[in-house]
Amino acid sequence: YERVPHYRDLTPEDEWALLERGLNRVTDTCIPEHEAFRRLQKHIYKIWKDADDKGERYFPHEFMYKMLLSGVLEEYYEIDLKDSWMYAAAEKNLPIIVPGWEDSTMGNIFASYVIKGDLKASTMKSGIEYMTSLADWYPKNSANGIGFFQIGGGIAGDFPICVVPMLYQDMEM
């Protein structure tokens, strides 16, 4: 990963130079494409394809859990698994709500396989299904109070706080 602290000042030429070096910029951080996403792609595709062939459907985080727990990424680990929050979540099968996943690099890769006809879009559960799942989970777990660990803003921040008004106002609970 490469930091770009002055990313707002980049010219189109600067942006192109980063891209030519194989770096995908996400705000102030450049992610080396072949060191991250392409490394995962062959492994996650097999898991997507297996589910697709069986007519099974999962959420994006469930597919990631399957990949992590399968051990196919062990050769790439750069930290001890005991220090990985994602691996700990996978081991405990914690619910992770990933709204807007379709607008991510992995979402784009999944969409490319759908466009090529290799996978069905319905294999991946949608954002609406995340909301309905959260709406089902919330009343079952909120009696003693609940907490969320939020990563990111925008839709990631708005999504969990929208479920309560939806339950009260739209569902009239």
Positions of PLM-derived features:
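Conserved catalytic alpha/beta core of Sir2/sirtuin-type deacylases, generalized to analogous enzyme cores
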Residues: 1-173
